[in-house]
Amino acid sequence: MKTTVGSRPNKYWPIVAGIGVVGLFAYLIFSNQKHSTESGDNIHKFANGGSYRDGSKSISYNRNHPFAYGNASSPGMLLPAMLTIIGIISYLWRTRDSVLGDSGGNNSCGEDCQGECLNGHSRRSLLCDIGXSFYHCSMAIVYISKQYTYGDWSLLLSRSELCEDLWNRGYEPRSYCGHPPLAEVPFWGISDVGRFNQCFEYSS
């Protein structure tokens, strides 16, 4: 005889629905306040401040904030804001070469460019910058041998260790501006040689 156990009904959904309905009504009540037009003694209230005097009774109201009732926009600030934005864009455009490494409009790199055209950055710092994720390489982890003599290539190195090791063996990241012929990998221990060749070149 086959026995099936039914799923337990969810008894919390009415509570959640009730809290949602009450919260919705509370939001509508507090967000749709009617503007009071009369005081407790039936003296008219001015919509935007002012004062009222009737015999011995006098009442005064503070004026509304200048930004009230849709007056928050300031047309007089449009021109200064536009000039500020134009100034920032102009500054970034003029300094793009120092940021992009002379690759934004004034590219003087030749076919033999090995990375010298990147202003302000040494090739070693580019190679060993972990945050650059191996320059533009999509390779996350590479297996490389630390003990080349014994052929122990199963050792997993961190990216910083791999950067230092590749630099010491004469490798540099490929440059964006020029694609010199890539050298063959002269040692054991590289996993996925094709992806390695897309990222580094032998320069020494």
Curated annotation (Swiss-Prot):
Enumerate the UniProt keywords alphabetically.
Host cell junction, Host cytoplasm, Host cytoskeleton, Host endoplasmic reticulum, Host membrane, Membrane, Transmembrane, Transmembrane helix, Transport, Viral movement protein
Q: Which InterPro entries match?
A: Plant_vir_prot
Q: Please, which domain of life does this record's source organism belong to? A: Viruses
What does the record give as the function of this protein? Participates in the transport of viral genome to neighboring plant cells directly through plasmodesmata, without any budding. TGBp2 and TGBp3 are necessary for intracellular delivery of TGBp1-containing vRNPs to plasmodesmata. Can gate plasmodesmata and increase their size exclusion limit. To a lesser extent than TGB3, induces host actin cytoskeleton network thickening, which probably plays a major role in virus cell-to-cell movement.
Q: Which segments sit on the Cytoplasmic face? A: 1-11, 94-204
Q: Name one GO biological process term.
A: transport of virus in host, cell to cell
Q: How does it assemble?
A: Interacts with movement protein TGB3. TGB1-TGB3-TGB2 complex formation is enhanced by ATP hydrolysis.
Give the transmembrane ranges.
12-32, 73-93
One Pfam family, please name it.
Plant_vir_prot
Q: Record's family? A: Belongs to the virgaviridae/benyvirus TGB2 movement protein family.
**Topology versus the membrane, per the UniProt entry?**
Multi-pass membrane protein
Presence of keyword Transmembrane helix = yes
Q: Which GO cellular component terms, listed alphabetically, does the Swiss-Prot or TrEMBL entry include?
A: host cell endoplasmic reticulum membrane; host cell plasmodesma; host cytoskeleton; membrane
Compartments where found: Host cell junction, Host plasmodesma; Host endoplasmic reticulum membrane; Host cytoplasm, Host cytoskeleton
What remark does the entry add?
This protein is translated as a fusion protein by episodic readthrough of a termination codon. Readthrough of the terminator codon TGA occurs between the codons for Gly-131 and Ser-133, thereby producing TGB2' minor translational readthrough protein.
Q: Using the UniProt record, give the first listed, main subcellular location.
A: host cell
Name of the protein described by the UniProt record: Movement protein TGB2
* Residue ranges, Lumenal side: 33-72
